[in-house]
Amino acid sequence: MGLQFLAPGEKVFPSLHRIIISTFALIAAYIFIVRPLRNILFHPLKKYPGPKLFGASSIPYGFYYMTGKWHLKIRNLHATYGPIVRIGPDELSYACPEAWEDIYGRYVPTKRRENPKPVWYCSPDAHDMVGASLGDHGRMRRVMAPGFTYSAMCKQEPLIKGHVDMFLSKLCSLCGDGRAEVNILDWLTYCTFDLIGDLSFGEPFGCMENNMLHPWLQLVFANIYITHIILLCQRIPFFYLFLPIKTTYQLWRDFRRHVVLLREVVERRLSLSTPRDDFLDVMTTKQTSTLYMTKEEIFKNAILLTGGGAETTSSSLSGMMYMLTMRPDVKEKILEELRDTFPSEDDINMRSVAQLTYTGAFIEESMRYYPPGPNTMWRITPPAGNTILGDYIPGNTIVGIPHRVLYRSEAYWKDADGFRPERWLPDSQRPAEFDEDKREGFHPFSYGPRACIAMNLAYAEMRYILARFLWHFDIEATKESKKWMDDQKAYLVWDKPGLFVHLKPRAGVKVAA
């Protein structure tokens, strides 16, 4: 009966075309209007200061991260809004040293749950310490800890010394009898990856021998941008629209091929019956029913130690080399300390360099000024939420501390943008103007039970390499490298251009063959 009221030619049902358009319009209205308004007006984090646009959607954050300039934007946001800033609908950034314990500290029953790493950042299925669950992380860390003790470092020193000898010898051959222009970043990368690779896989990558990065490492360094955009896409699927499909597929294919080759290296090392005092020795000996590592965990942690350990060390050392070229006064103070402490190069070893007070202060200041991990190491509150700085934070909130922002904050550091190694000297030697610096808030290797297990080894290596390098060479900036730090892009690590310097061997100093 009702059909008789329809106008001539009018359809009972709308066309499929109109249904599709209406559906997309509703979805778009929800994504771009309803959800952003809900995030601004009704979200549990609405009380925290920050730009409304960032509180409405994660997309503005994602665009800044894609450009590699997020470390600059987040500093401006903290300067405008204060130490706690809402930078996404469900994300808070803390630029205050008091937050380290609450965000990265250990699980304390009845007081604080652990804030795990988000699965899009570090998956528990990765079989390494970074993404492992609380129990698996503790088990793996207890297995590996003996490899990073003082006594283990002493056993590893001959191997480390051999690689540093080759590093110095290669630089000396490049210089010949005079001054040479050298990309010191490349050679620091070759040295640290050969060294850590030898400790992790049982053989070096051959970077110094071949004057080039191993193909696996070339793949990693040539695709820093793509690998970090993939990480961003896993967090914010919208950015898959900007992912170059062909390049990403080639990267995935090449990684799979190199993983097969690296597995063969590990198998070859594990088949050896002779102990080498390396990390694989530690991971495979004295295993029990509760203290063990599977073969997959051994392999994945070997990759983790190589990539994470070597990149952090080479990045930090390159920052130090740059500062030596820009601050000749600081370089002279380090040289004076070396000459006063060591009668000869034979006295320089990984234990004796620990007594270098000013050199140690220089290393700390270099990592404050140019932290190897400039941005945030993300954590996420558990589903039941957590308490941070006395405030309840809802579950599944992303939280973290941006290293570079905290270390350059005038609220916590005197002359924060100045390079002042003396701020790290012992109390009796430190100028009074730095007494209020928040040195206890400085954690370049992270904080808590998941802090870098190789931190002490990294510090010893950096002191040792730096001391022996300056014993052998004078270093000066080239014209093109004087602004080396100025325009670098930053993701989880720095995307660094070549650091070209002038090297000149010191008269009368010979390098071991």
Curated annotation (Swiss-Prot):
Top-level EC class as recorded in UniProt: oxidoreductase
Disulphide linkage map: none
Cofactor dependency: heme
Transmembrane regions: 13-33, 212-232
A single cellular component GO annotation: membrane
UniProt-listed InterPro entries: Cyt_P450 (IPR001128), Cyt_P450_CS (IPR017972), Cyt_P450_E_grp-I (IPR002401), Cyt_P450_sf (IPR036396), Cytochrome_P450_monoxygenase (IPR050121)
Pathway: Mycotoxin biosynthesis
Cellular compartment(s): Membrane
Membrane topology per record: Multi-pass membrane protein
EC number(s) recorded for this UniProt protein: 1.-.-.-
Biological role stated in the UniProt entry: Cytochrome P450 monooxygenase; part of the gene cluster that mediates the biosynthesis of the phytotoxin stemphyloxin II. The first step of the pathway is the synthesis of dehydroprobetaenone I by the polyketide synthase sthA and the enoyl reductase sthE via condensation of one acetyl-CoA starter unit with 7 malonyl-CoA units and 5 methylations. The C-terminal reductase (R) domain of sthA catalyzes the reductive release of the polyketide chain. Because sthA lacks a designated enoylreductase (ER) domain, the required activity is provided the enoyl reductase sthE.
Name of the protein this chain belongs to: Cytochrome P450 monooxygenase sthF
Organism: Phaeosphaeria nodorum (strain SN15 / ATCC MYA-4574 / FGSC 10173)
Higher taxonomy: Eukaryota, Fungi, Dikarya, Ascomycota, Pezizomycotina
